[in-house]
Amino acid sequence: IFSMTKAESKVIDFIKKHILLFLLVAVTIIAIFLRICGMDFQSDDFNSFLNSWWSIIKLNDFTGLATQVGNYNIPYQVIIYLMTLLPLNALYAYKIVSIIFDFVLAISTAMLVYSFAKNNRRLKAILTYSAVLLSATVIFNSSFWAQCDSIYTSFIILAILFLHKDKPIASFVFIGIAFAFKLQTIFIIPVL
C-alpha cells in the first residue's frame, strides 16, 4: 500500500550497505558510556594500594623506578610514571590506561577471529569486538576496579595472531611483552 520515495530508498540502501559499520560505532559508543559509568568508583585495591603507589612513583620521578613500587612489573610502572606527567588524578589515570587496552584487546581479538574465520569474516570480527568490549568482566576490571589485565591479555592475543600468520618472531616479541607485564602469561606459553 505504501511505497517508498526515492530518497527513502537510498537511505535504506545506505543503511543496509553499511550496517556493520553502524554496529561497530554503536557498540563503541555503548562501551565508552559503560566505562564512563565506572570512572568514579574507588575499589578497595585502589584505596589500599594503587593510590599510594601512584604517589610514590610521582614523588620519586623516573629515577624512582630503580626500586620496586608495589607488586607490578616495571613496564606497567613506567606507564604509570608517564601518566603522572599528565594533569590527571590517580584514579582516572589508572582507569584510562586499562580502558585503552580494553580497546586494544577487542581489536586484536577481532583481528584474530577475522584471520581464522572462513566466511562472514567481517561480521564475526565485529561480533567478537562487541563481545569483548561489552563483557562485564572486561568492563568491571578496567573502569570500575582499575585493574590492568587487558594489557597483558592484549599482548597474548597479538602473540597468537602473529603465530597464526606464521610470524614467530613477532609472536614471541608479543608474548615476551605480555610476560613482562604479568607473570600469569606463563600459562599460555605451552599453547604457543
For the regions a language model picked out, list residue spans one by one:
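Transmembrane signal-anchor helices characteristic of membrane glycosylation enzymes that use polyprenol
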Residues: 14-49, 99-102, 130, 134-140
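Extracytoplasmic catalytic/substrate-binding loops of multi-pass membrane glycan-assembly enzymes
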Residues: 38-53, 67-79, 92
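Multi-pass, polyprenyl lipid-linked donor-dependent membrane glycosyltransferases
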Residues: 97-100, 130-134, 138-157, 181, ...
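Transmembrane-helix motifs of polytopic, lipid-linked glycan transferases
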Residues: 96-119
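Specific aromatic-rich, kink-prone transmembrane helix
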Residues: 108-111, 151-168
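Perimembrane helix-loop-helix junctions
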Residues: 4-6, 188-192
